[in-house]
Design a protein with these regions (language model features):
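Acidic, glycine-rich loop-and-beta core segments that form the ion-binding/anion-interacting portion
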Residues: 444-523
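Short secondary-structure boundary elements
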Residues: 3, 35-269, 273-282, 546
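Sensor-1/coupling segment of RecA-like P-loop NTPase cores
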Residues: 1-33
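Generic long, charged, amphipathic alpha-helical segments
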Residues: 554-612
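Inter-helical turn/loop elements of alpha-helical hairpins
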Residues: 9-10, 172, 198-399, 425-439, ...
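Short, flexible, glycine-rich and Lys/Arg-enriched loop motifs at helix boundaries
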Residues: 279-287, 401-416
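Generic helix N-cap/helix-start motif at coil->alpha-helix transitions
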Residues: 226-230, 247-248, 370, 417-420, ...
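Alpha-helical scaffold segments of alpha-solenoid architecture
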Residues: 488, 495-496, 500-568, 575-576, ...
Length: 664
């Protein structure tokens, strides 16, 4: 004979089954087989057998284990409920969990809910009230929190919880919990998350809200001065209790803490809840002050997750600007103007960006002077003014104070000194100082090691620099590292930049069409953020890659589109290189005279920009045009440019130039 029973139910019902089983075992007449909880691997195996015909994703197995704690009955019933409701279905060769027809998802199967509610109904009123407060507190709780709902004194609640835990009913003991106010009480955890869910959902809405407030009050007193470090927990209870005024500062604190941990997606969730809560408060200066701080925090968070030029970033800073003006907040205005300047910069609106930054400096405050110089370095670099860019970057670094509070970093989430170093690096390459450029790029990375977003930026810029230097293998390595950092932390703009540079480098090192596809995909992702800043540059990389993999004709179409995008009304740092690439492609088609003209245009533009490295590269390629020997004038010009260099003699261009000059 085989029989089953639950020890906790037998104890609750007063049935003698436990004693009977012990006596039978003592006489050797029975064997007890305890069915333990399943681990994550066992749950995955159960799902694999119960869901044939498609793969079971690891995240689905983890979710089921988390919801059921591995209780076999719960696993089977939850799986059955989701499949019966059509919420779990195969798609593209794998099982996917989707919302049901009503837009929600069945958290507790009906049969299982009835079973759990029967167990709850066997409790006396005091135990049930105590467990309801505990359910409001969370999956883990202190007895002191459970006592806040009026279910008795701390000692009485602690004793009741301990009794339930001893009998294996609903709770497990976890050890003592000490709060900063001196309170020490026993800690407990719900045996199963489904128990807590059923308990929580059966509490009437009004009582549930009051319990959340009671729990928040007790936690706030218990945490005392340390309450700020528990801001997210307190905000959750206060929102659930509809106390939006008290929840607001905790949500702001939680968002600020998330940004400090480089968790911008988490910060956005808190800030969206905060902005919603503020709409429920009376209008007035106090509400506007809170919204201003929220929008100023939202700008950098959105920048990190959606890109510099996204409409959401512009909307956050635009609203913050309106509030700064209304509240007369000059300090905050400087931060907001910088954010708007960054948006303009990454949409290639250089004049607007420069005007906003000049306005910041004209305000005569030291606030964000470093950041303003950093963004001016970016703006002037993209306009082809490498010398001005380097000057702004170095003035910014002169303002950098290592001991200053850089909690917010730049208003778009990046360490300003890191940015100054890498703009100095990129400008220096164009100015003909490739080795010093590399030193600045490496300093940027060293400074960024403790801040993931700045680290992703510094690694991307190292990939840029090696691309400029013509070192495809090094560019590929740094692009790979940048992609790993950016993808791991959820920084899409840096991820797509790394993908573009990595695609170019892959095409140049292996002539693999996969590099071109990666480059195209990255470019599409870049444009999807709304950014236009480097669009012509990326098209130049695509043309260069196409020349290696598919031949010159398609590359010519792409590079001519890049030149058209730059137009005639604005300078652009990479325009000399675009004409040089066009010359290379024309030369490969055997059109030597047209190629020479393209090189001449590249040389003219580079000389006008004062960008010595770009001028030397164009002169070098002009000397190597197919079916055409370099003229003495071309060779003399290359010699003149080569002799101006004082460093970088190991870089590919200078090595090739030296070989060509010595060969002649």
């Amino acid at each position: 004979m085989t029989g089953t029973y639950r020890p906790a139910d037998a104890l609750a019902g007063g049935a003698p089954i436990g004693d009977l089983g012990a006596e039978l075992r003592l006489r050797g007449l029975a064997t007890e087989l305890r069915l333990g909880e399943l681990g994550p691997g066992a749950v995955a195996a159960v799902l694999g057998r119960g869901l044939p015909g498609a793969d079971v994703p690891e995240e689905l197995a983890r979710l089921v284990h988390r919801r059921t704690d591995g209780v076999p009955l719960f696993v089977v019933q939850l799986l059955q409920a989701w499949t019966d409701a059509g919420e779990l279905r195969p798609a593209d060769g794998r099982w996917e969990l989707t919302p049901g027809p009503d837009g929600g998802r069945q958290e507790v199967p009906d049969d299982l809910r009835r079973l759990l509610e029967l167990q709850l109904e066997r409790l006396d009123a005091d135990d049930l009230a105590m467990l309801e407060t505990a359910a409001v507190s969370g999956i883990e709780f202190a007895a002191a929190t459970a006592a806040s709902g009026g279910a008795g004194t701390l000692e009485a609640v602690e004793g009741r919880c301990a009794a339930l835990a001893r009998h294996g009913r609903f709770l497990r003991a976890t050890g003592p919990v000490a709060w900063p106010d001196g309170t020490v009480s026993a800690g407990f955890r719900f045996a199963h998350d489904l128990h807590r869910t059923v308990l929580y959902e059966r509490i009437p809405a009004g009582r549930r809200a009051r319990l959340h407030i009671a729990v928040a009050d007790r936690l706030e007193r218990g945490y005392g001065p340390a309450a700020a470090t528990h801001a997210a927990e307190l905000a959750g209870h206060l929102l659930a209790g509809y106390d939006h005024a008290r929840a607001a500062p905790h949500l702001q604190a939680a968002a600020t803490q998330a940004m400090g941990r480089s968790a911008p997606r988490e910060a956005i969730q808190y800030l969206e809840s905060l902005l919603d809560a503020l709409t429920r408060l009376p209008e007035g200066p106090e509400r506007d002050e809170a919204e201003l701080l929220a929008q100023m925090t939202l700008g950098p968070a959105l920048t990190a997750t959606r890109g510099f030029a996204s409409p959401e970033v512009e909307a956050a800073y635009t609203r913050a600007h309106e509030l700064c003006v209304a509240l007369d907040r000059p300090h905050e205005l400087v931060l907001v103007l910088h954010g708007l300047a960054a948006v303009a910069e990454f949409r290639a609106r250089y004049h607007r960006s420069e005007a906003l930054l000049t306005r910041i400096l004209a305000l005569g405050t030291s606030d964000l002077a470093l950041e303003a110089h950093e963004l001016l370095a970016c703006s002037t670099f993209h306009q082809g003014a490498a010398a001005r860019s380097f000057g702004y970057a170095m003035r910014g670094l002169a303002l950098y104070d290592e001991g200053a509070d850089h909690t917010y970093l730049a208003p778009y989430g990046e360490h300003p000194a890191v940015s100054c170093h890498y703009w100095a690096a990129l400008a220096l390459w164009f100015l003909g100082r490739p080795d010093t450029a590399l030193e600045h790029a490496e300093q940027a990375r060293e400074l960024a090691t403790t801040h993931p977003y700045s680290l992703a930026s510094a690694e991307v810029q190292l990939a840029y620099l090696h691309q400029y230097r013509g070192e495809a293998e090094a560019a590929l390595a740094w692009a790979g590292r940048a992609l790993a950092t950016a993808s791991g932390h959820g920084f899409p703009i840096r991820a797509v930049q790394a993908a573009i540079l990595g695609g170019w480098a892959l095409a140049m090192t292996s002539a693999d069409s996969g590099g071109v596809e990666q480059l195209r995909s990255g470019l599409a992702g870049y444009l999807a953020t709304g950014a236009e800043l480097d669009h012509p540059y990326y098209l130049g990389l695509l043309a260069d890659a196409l020349a290696t993999t598919t031949g010159p004709s398609e590359g010519l179409v792409v590079v001519e589109e890049a030149i058209r995008l730059v137009g005639t009304e604005r300078p652009f740092y990479y325009l000399p290189e675009l004409h040089r690439i066009r010359g290379d492609l024309l030369a490969r088609e055997g059109r030597a005279d047209q190629a020479a003209a393209a090189y001449a245009r590249a040389i003219e533009l580079a000389a006008g920009h004062g960008t010595r490295s770009a001028e030397l590269r164009a002169a070098l390629h002009r000397c190597r045009v197919q079916d055409r020997s370099p003229t003495e004038a071309d060779r003399a010009h290359l010699r003149q440019l080569y002799d101006q260099f004082e460093e970088g003699f190991g870089t590919p261009d200078l090595v090739a130039a030296k070989a060509l000059l010595e060969d002649g």
